[in-house]
Regions:
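Serine/threonine-rich, repeat-prone extracellular segments and beta-strand-based repeat modules
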Residues: 48-93, 133-168
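C-terminal motif of bacterial Sec signal peptides marking the signal peptidase cleavage site
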Residues: 13-16
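Residue-level signal for mature regions of secreted extracellular proteins and peptides
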Residues: 10-11, 100
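Interdomain boundary/hinge segments at the C-termini of tandem beta-sandwich modules
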Residues: 97-103
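Positively charged n-region of N-terminal signal peptides that target proteins for export
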Residues: 1-4
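Solvent-exposed, low-complexity, repeat-rich "mucin-like" stalks and linkers
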Residues: 18-60, 103-135
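Well-ordered beta-strand positions in beta-sheet-rich domains
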Residues: 27, 92-96, 111-113, 165-169
């Protein structure tokens, strides 16, 4: 009887001393446009009891669809910091997901030469077909006031400063 009691006490001590839910880290940084899943195992050191756990958003304006978190009205979470928690019954373990944009715009076309008329405005996107989840802007120092051949660098940027430079003549 004393042996059984000792085993029960030891089991309770071992179970009671375990930390249970342990996050891999307090802040997770994810690239803009990447899926942010509501799967607890992605954020835990030990996923032994993950079937009873749930990832919940603590930030407003976030929807959960198909086990993914996204900004309301979008297919992804926009750039920013978001509060989440792993819920285990009535206990919550908070963490942050930081969404960053570090990727430059992508150009569908690689143009090396263009011809424009004197005084013509240039629609750079019609040549490069650049895309980025954060939008794109074009910057080029070109003079179309007279006929000439020019070597021009076109800087294609997103609103977070990521850019790519294309050379055209």
């Amino acid at each position: 009887m004393l042996k059984k009691l000792g085993i029960v006490v030891l089991t309770l001590l071992l179970c009671g001393c375990s930390n249970g839910v342990q996050l891999k880290k307090q802040m997770f940084t994810i690239e803009l446009g990447k899926d942010i899943y509501a799967n607890p195992t992605l954020y835990l050191k030990n996923a032994t009891y993950s079937s009873r756990l749930k990832v919940v958003s603590k930030s407003v304006g976030i929807d959960k669809k198909n086990n993914r978190f996204m900004t309301s009205g979008m297919d992804y979470l926009v750039v920013g910091e978001y509060d989440f928690a792993i819920r285990d019954g009535n206990k919550e373990y908070p963490f942050v997901i930081k969404v960053k944009d570090t990727t430059p715009p992508v150009c569908a076309s690689d143009v090396s030469e263009i011809k424009v008329g004197v005084g013509q405005n240039i629609d750079w996107n019609s040549y490069f077909h650049a895309t980025d989840l954060s939008g794109v802007t074009f910057e080029a120092n070109v003079d179309t006031s007279s006929a000439s051949t020019q070597d021009v660098q076109v800087k294609i940027s997103d609103r977070f400063g990521n850019s790519v430079t294309k050379n055209v003549s």
